[in-house]
């Protein structure tokens, strides 16, 4: 399920599969059913798989209007996004992926996800065909298989403290006060086998604990990563 959408594969495939957390919480309002199936990730990034079953009377070409994600972490610098990734006409089921990133560890913490309204995107008036809120809360309890590499590399603009690698992200931490909010960051990772995992996007968060979050299209094997490249400069791990 979730592993299929994230592209889990590689030398640690079994370990990655086993770190998927089952949630299986479901709510139904007026025939519309939302189910939170699974969660997967590390201490700072969570992927959540949710399904929406659309009843007769609602347009299947519609979708959930809004997804809101909250944590109980203070000053966590959390960012999130969500995407409709699949529609099964035969079962009238839509699949959504929600991604949450936090500066503070989310392990053993509770996250809250709310699915709000259902609208027909094919309707030029963009009307809501269902109004209601599905409210879910669950504690993150999957196995954390991230590894951290110390670097302490200095440049004229910043000091790279460490890189934390997980199957879904690479988090590059800086010394506080050494980063520029407007600094343009271009990052990628270096692998043992020469492969170049495609970077989906890069989030640069200079506040609180300055860090770069590199998000990959597919799940990576942290053991296959031997270094990083920041703005054309290579940093190889020594351990």
Regions picked out by a protein language model, each given a short descriptive name:
Residues 1-239:
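Alpha-helical, hydrophobic structural elements that either
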């Amino acid at each position: 399920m979730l592993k299929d959408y994230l592209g889990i594969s590689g030398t640690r495939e079994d370990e990655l599969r086993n770190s998927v957390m089952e949630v299986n919480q479901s709510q139904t309002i007026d025939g519309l059913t939302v189910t939170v199936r699974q969660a997967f990730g590390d201490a700072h990034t969570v992927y959540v798989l949710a399904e929406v079953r659309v009843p007769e009377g609602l347009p299947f070409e519609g979708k959930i209007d809004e997804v809101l994600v909250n944590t109980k972490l203070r000053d966590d610098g959390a960012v999130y996004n969500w995407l409709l990734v699949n529609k099964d006409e035969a079962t009238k089921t839509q699949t959504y992926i929600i991604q949450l990133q936090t500066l503070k560890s989310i392990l053993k913490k509770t996250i809250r996800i709310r699915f709000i309204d259902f609208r027909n995107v094919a309707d030029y008036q963009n009307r809501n065909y269902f109004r209601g809120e599905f409210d879910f809360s669950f504690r993150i309890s999957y196995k954390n298989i991230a590894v951290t590499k110390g670097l302490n590399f200095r440049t004229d603009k910043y000091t790279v403290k460490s890189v934390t690698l997980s199957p879904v992200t690479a988090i590059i931490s800086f010394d506080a006060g050494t980063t520029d909010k407007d600094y343009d960051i271009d990052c990628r990772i270096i692998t043992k086998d020469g492969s170049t995992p495609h970077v989906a996007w890069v989030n640069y968060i200079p506040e609180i604990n300055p860090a770069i979050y590199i998000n990959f299209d597919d799940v990576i094997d942290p053991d296959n990563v031997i270094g990083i490249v920041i703005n054309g400069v290579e940093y190889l791990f020594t351990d």
